[in-house]
Design a protein with these regions (language model features):
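A short, ordered amphipathic alpha-helix with a cationic face
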Residues: 26-27, 47, 80, 110-114, ...
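Short, flexible helical or helix-coil boundary motifs
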Residues: 44, 77-80, 84
Protein backbone atom coordinates (compact mmCIF):
# COMPACT_ATOMS: atom_id res chain seq x y z
CA UNK A 1 0.00 0.00 0.00
CA UNK A 2 1.36 3.38 -0.95
CA UNK A 3 1.53 6.01 1.76
CA UNK A 4 0.40 9.53 0.91
CA UNK A 5 1.33 12.84 2.54
CA UNK A 6 0.41 14.75 4.53
CA UNK A 7 0.26 12.08 7.22
CA UNK A 8 -0.61 12.62 10.86
CA UNK A 9 -1.20 9.28 12.48
CA UNK A 10 0.65 7.35 9.78
CA UNK A 11 -1.36 4.25 10.59
CA UNK A 12 -0.80 2.83 7.13
CA UNK A 13 2.97 3.35 7.22
CA UNK A 14 3.47 1.65 10.56
CA UNK A 15 1.10 -1.20 9.83
CA UNK A 16 2.40 -2.07 6.37
CA UNK A 17 6.05 -1.11 6.67
CA UNK A 18 6.19 1.97 4.48
CA UNK A 19 9.64 3.26 3.65
CA UNK A 20 11.45 6.19 5.21
CA UNK A 21 10.89 8.13 1.98
CA UNK A 22 7.13 7.68 2.31
CA UNK A 23 7.19 8.86 5.92
CA UNK A 24 9.01 12.03 4.93
CA UNK A 25 7.14 12.76 1.69
CA UNK A 26 6.15 16.43 1.97
CA UNK A 27 4.87 16.89 -1.57
CA UNK A 28 1.38 17.75 -0.34
CA UNK A 29 2.63 20.23 2.28
CA UNK A 30 2.52 23.92 1.30
CA UNK A 31 6.03 25.18 0.57
CA UNK A 32 5.81 27.79 3.32
CA UNK A 33 5.32 25.06 5.94
CA UNK A 34 7.98 22.61 4.85
CA UNK A 35 11.03 24.12 6.58
CA UNK A 36 9.55 23.87 10.07
CA UNK A 37 8.28 20.37 9.38
CA UNK A 38 11.67 19.27 8.04
CA UNK A 39 13.38 20.67 11.15
CA UNK A 40 11.02 18.72 13.38
CA UNK A 41 11.50 15.53 11.38
CA UNK A 42 15.28 15.92 11.61
CA UNK A 43 15.23 16.05 15.42
CA UNK A 44 16.50 12.70 16.79
CA UNK A 45 14.46 10.72 19.29
CA UNK A 46 15.48 11.21 22.90
CA UNK A 47 17.96 8.62 24.10
CA UNK A 48 16.39 5.85 26.14
CA UNK A 49 12.83 6.59 25.09
CA UNK A 50 10.38 3.70 24.72
CA UNK A 51 8.28 5.02 21.87
CA UNK A 52 7.77 2.85 18.78
CA UNK A 53 10.24 3.60 16.01
CA UNK A 54 9.40 6.84 14.17
CA UNK A 55 6.46 7.66 16.44
CA UNK A 56 8.13 10.93 17.38
CA UNK A 57 8.57 11.93 13.76
CA UNK A 58 4.96 11.05 13.08
CA UNK A 59 3.85 13.62 15.62
CA UNK A 60 5.66 16.36 13.73
CA UNK A 61 2.71 16.45 11.37
CA UNK A 62 0.53 17.68 14.24
CA UNK A 63 2.44 20.97 14.13
CA UNK A 64 1.20 21.84 10.65
CA UNK A 65 -1.04 24.93 10.44
CA UNK A 66 -4.75 24.79 9.73
CA UNK A 67 -5.66 23.66 6.22
CA UNK A 68 -7.71 25.21 4.69
CA UNK A 69 -6.35 28.31 6.37
CA UNK A 70 -8.58 30.94 7.92
CA UNK A 71 -7.57 33.27 5.10
CA UNK A 72 -8.60 30.67 2.52
CA UNK A 73 -11.98 30.18 4.20
CA UNK A 74 -12.65 33.91 4.40
CA UNK A 75 -11.67 34.35 0.74
CA UNK A 76 -13.86 31.46 -0.42
CA UNK A 77 -16.87 32.85 1.43
CA UNK A 78 -16.58 36.03 -0.64
CA UNK A 79 -16.48 34.17 -3.96
CA UNK A 80 -19.56 33.20 -6.01
CA UNK A 81 -20.75 29.84 -4.66
CA UNK A 82 -17.70 29.84 -2.43
CA UNK A 83 -19.74 28.49 0.47
CA UNK A 84 -20.64 25.44 -1.60
CA UNK A 85 -17.01 24.94 -2.58
CA UNK A 86 -15.98 25.22 1.06
CA UNK A 87 -18.53 22.62 2.11
CA UNK A 88 -17.27 20.26 -0.59
CA UNK A 89 -13.70 20.83 0.57
CA UNK A 90 -14.58 19.87 4.13
CA UNK A 91 -16.65 16.91 2.93
CA UNK A 92 -13.59 15.65 1.03
CA UNK A 93 -11.40 16.05 4.13
CA UNK A 94 -13.99 14.16 6.21
CA UNK A 95 -14.11 11.35 3.67
CA UNK A 96 -10.31 11.09 3.45
CA UNK A 97 -10.03 11.00 7.24
CA UNK A 98 -11.96 7.73 7.36
CA UNK A 99 -11.25 6.19 3.97
CA UNK A 100 -7.53 6.91 3.56
CA UNK A 101 -5.56 6.05 6.72
CA UNK A 102 -2.64 8.14 5.47
CA UNK A 103 -4.79 11.25 5.83
CA UNK A 104 -6.20 10.49 9.25
CA UNK A 105 -6.61 13.50 11.56
CA UNK A 106 -6.31 16.03 8.75
CA UNK A 107 -9.96 16.53 9.66
CA UNK A 108 -8.89 17.91 13.04
CA UNK A 109 -6.26 20.06 11.37
CA UNK A 110 -9.08 21.68 9.38
CA UNK A 111 -10.56 22.93 12.69
CA UNK A 112 -7.29 23.88 14.37
CA UNK A 113 -7.51 27.68 14.59
CA UNK A 114 -11.17 28.54 15.14
CA UNK A 115 -10.50 29.33 18.81
CA UNK A 116 -8.14 32.17 17.93
CA UNK A 117 -9.46 35.71 17.68
CA UNK A 118 -9.34 35.62 13.89
CA UNK A 119 -10.75 32.10 13.87
CA UNK A 120 -13.74 33.19 15.93
CA UNK A 121 -14.43 35.95 13.42
CA UNK A 122 -14.13 33.62 10.43
CA UNK A 123 -16.30 30.94 12.06
CA UNK A 124 -18.99 33.54 12.80
CA UNK A 125 -18.81 34.75 9.18
CA UNK A 126 -19.09 31.20 7.85
CA UNK A 127 -22.01 30.28 10.11
CA UNK A 128 -23.85 33.53 9.33
CA UNK A 129 -23.62 32.84 5.61
CA UNK A 130 -24.53 29.13 5.68
CA UNK A 131 -26.13 28.19 9.02
CA UNK A 132 -27.35 24.97 7.42
CA UNK A 133 -23.80 23.69 6.95
CA UNK A 134 -22.79 21.09 9.53
CA UNK A 135 -19.15 22.03 8.96
CA UNK A 136 -19.88 25.71 9.62
CA UNK A 137 -21.85 24.87 12.77
CA UNK A 138 -18.98 22.74 14.04
CA UNK A 139 -16.56 25.60 13.40
CA UNK A 140 -18.81 28.09 15.17
CA UNK A 141 -19.37 25.72 18.08
CA UNK A 142 -15.63 25.14 18.43
CA UNK A 143 -14.98 28.89 18.37
CA UNK A 144 -17.52 29.49 21.13
CA UNK A 145 -16.04 26.63 23.15
CA UNK A 146 -12.75 28.49 22.90
CA UNK A 147 -14.46 31.57 24.33
CA UNK A 148 -15.83 29.46 27.18
CA UNK A 149 -12.36 28.17 28.00
CA UNK A 150 -11.01 31.73 27.97
CA UNK A 151 -13.76 32.83 30.34
CA UNK A 152 -13.13 29.94 32.71
CA UNK A 153 -9.36 29.74 32.70
CA UNK A 154 -7.42 26.54 33.30
CA UNK A 155 -7.18 26.47 37.10
CA UNK A 156 -8.81 23.90 39.36
CA UNK A 157 -12.52 24.49 39.97
CA UNK A 158 -11.79 25.46 43.58
CA UNK A 159 -9.58 28.27 42.27
CA UNK A 160 -12.13 29.52 39.72
CA UNK A 161 -14.63 32.25 40.59
CA UNK A 162 -18.40 31.95 40.21
CA UNK A 163 -18.30 34.82 37.72
CA UNK A 164 -15.85 32.90 35.55
CA UNK A 165 -17.99 29.77 35.69
CA UNK A 166 -21.17 31.71 34.89
CA UNK A 167 -19.52 33.30 31.87
CA UNK A 168 -18.30 29.90 30.72
CA UNK A 169 -21.76 28.37 31.12
CA UNK A 170 -23.45 31.09 29.08
CA UNK A 171 -21.06 30.41 26.21
CA UNK A 172 -21.52 26.65 26.40
CA UNK A 173 -25.31 26.99 26.20
CA UNK A 174 -24.72 28.38 22.70
CA UNK A 175 -22.00 25.92 21.70
CA UNK A 176 -23.72 22.65 22.64
CA UNK A 177 -26.73 22.91 20.28
CA UNK A 178 -24.44 23.90 17.41
CA UNK A 179 -22.15 20.94 17.94
CA UNK A 180 -24.97 18.47 18.52
CA UNK A 181 -26.79 19.54 15.36
CA UNK A 182 -23.55 19.36 13.37
CA UNK A 183 -23.02 15.81 14.59
CA UNK A 184 -26.60 14.83 13.77
CA UNK A 185 -26.14 15.98 10.17
CA UNK A 186 -22.60 14.58 9.87
CA UNK A 187 -22.39 11.66 12.33
CA UNK A 188 -18.70 11.10 11.58
CA UNK A 189 -17.66 14.69 12.22
CA UNK A 190 -15.44 13.69 15.12
CA UNK A 191 -14.07 17.19 15.93
CA UNK A 192 -17.61 18.15 16.99
CA UNK A 193 -17.82 14.93 19.00
CA UNK A 194 -14.53 15.66 20.78
CA UNK A 195 -15.73 19.19 21.58
CA UNK A 196 -18.84 17.74 23.24
CA UNK A 197 -16.64 15.49 25.40
CA UNK A 198 -14.64 18.57 26.36
CA UNK A 199 -17.81 20.40 27.34
CA UNK A 200 -19.04 17.42 29.34
CA UNK A 201 -15.79 17.49 31.30
CA UNK A 202 -15.97 21.25 31.79
CA UNK A 203 -19.42 21.27 33.38
CA UNK A 204 -19.38 17.72 34.80
CA UNK A 205 -22.28 16.75 32.54
CA UNK A 206 -21.85 12.99 32.73
CA UNK A 207 -24.62 12.01 30.25
CA UNK A 208 -23.30 14.43 27.60
CA UNK A 209 -19.71 13.37 28.15
CA UNK A 210 -20.42 9.64 28.17
CA UNK A 211 -22.67 9.80 25.12
CA UNK A 212 -20.09 11.78 23.15
CA UNK A 213 -17.26 9.53 24.31
CA UNK A 214 -19.16 6.43 23.23
CA UNK A 215 -19.92 8.00 19.85
CA UNK A 216 -16.34 9.15 19.26
CA UNK A 217 -14.90 5.79 20.25
CA UNK A 218 -17.26 3.99 17.89
CA UNK A 219 -16.60 6.14 14.82
CA UNK A 220 -12.95 7.13 15.28
CA UNK A 221 -11.10 4.79 17.68
CA UNK A 222 -7.61 5.41 16.27
CA UNK A 223 -7.65 9.20 16.24
CA UNK A 224 -4.98 10.84 18.39
CA UNK A 225 -7.44 13.58 19.32
CA UNK A 226 -10.18 11.16 20.35
CA UNK A 227 -7.80 9.11 22.48
CA UNK A 228 -6.35 12.20 24.12
CA UNK A 229 -9.81 12.87 25.54
CA UNK A 230 -9.54 9.69 27.62
CA UNK A 231 -6.65 11.34 29.46
CA UNK A 232 -8.53 14.63 29.79
CA UNK A 233 -11.53 12.83 31.25
CA UNK A 234 -9.25 11.05 33.74
CA UNK A 235 -7.59 14.31 34.85
CA UNK A 236 -8.19 14.99 38.58
CA UNK A 237 -9.12 18.59 37.69
CA UNK A 238 -12.19 17.28 35.85
CA UNK A 239 -13.31 14.74 38.44
CA UNK A 240 -10.86 11.99 37.57
CA UNK A 241 -8.02 10.48 39.55
CA UNK A 242 -4.52 9.12 39.08
CA UNK A 243 -6.00 5.62 39.02
CA UNK A 244 -8.26 6.68 36.17
CA UNK A 245 -5.25 8.09 34.34
CA UNK A 246 -3.54 4.71 34.64
CA UNK A 247 -6.67 3.01 33.29
CA UNK A 248 -6.89 5.45 30.38
CA UNK A 249 -3.23 4.92 29.51
CA UNK A 250 -3.75 1.15 29.49
CA UNK A 251 -6.80 1.50 27.24
CA UNK A 252 -4.84 3.66 24.80
CA UNK A 253 -1.87 1.29 24.92
CA UNK A 254 -4.07 -1.45 23.45
CA UNK A 255 -4.44 0.65 20.30
CA UNK A 256 -0.78 1.56 19.86
CA UNK A 257 -0.08 -1.36 17.54
CA UNK A 258 -2.59 0.03 15.06
CA UNK A 259 -1.64 3.67 15.65
CA UNK A 260 1.87 4.14 17.11
CA UNK A 261 1.40 7.89 17.49
CA UNK A 262 -0.71 7.04 20.53
CA UNK A 263 2.39 5.72 22.35
Amino acid sequence: MKCLAPILLLTTCFASGCTRDALEDMSAVPAADRAALQACMATPDLAGNHWPERAGKARCWLSLPQNPSLQDISRMLKEPQGDLKLDRRYAEILSAHFNDPAHRDLLFLAYKDFRTEEGQRVAAEWFAKVPGSAFARAARGDAILGMAWKARGHAFASQTSDAQLDSMTSQLKIAVPLLESALRDEPKLSPACVDLIDIGNLVDATPLRDSAMQHCSAIDPLSWHVNSMYLTEADPRWGGSFDKIDQAVEQIRLRVKESPMLA
